[in-house]
């Protein structure tokens, strides 16, 4: 796939990487792309043979500016916490904790809060070429993952919409219009801020906001000059 089509690429637990994939990621980030990866990145190739030289393998360490030197697998009921360096925000951790060794120039975004690796990097950010590479070394809670993704979206210059919980948003474009789709997946009515235009499902004109009934949807056509 041509990764340059995307402003942001997310690699969750990409344990196996085929030869040549790392080079695609490298070129994508060097050319200005933003990538977010998690623990267990690039451990083996397509034959389940470990990449030699450390993890993440096949040259991905240079892109992310970090080496995963050890993996702590937590028992059910055990946990840790990530502490954000700039805000002191804390997020809970379960299941996996990689011990990360940041390279020179790599920003430590969050550190572990307990155990023998307390104070060591848990989340990192590396500027590589014209782009950005984020590495999440532990299984964070939803708030922790959201904090990393918000930062990555900002670097990728992707506008993040402030939507009610359970509302999905999708956008498609034609030569003369944008089509905004809002889907309420909850069992409650919600009010959402939308673009001014015509709701193609109801046939009504919408000015800035509307209420979506439970399990309801709308498709707003916004004319583009």
Protein language model annotation of sequence segments:
Residues 1-2:
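A short, well-structured beta->alpha microelement
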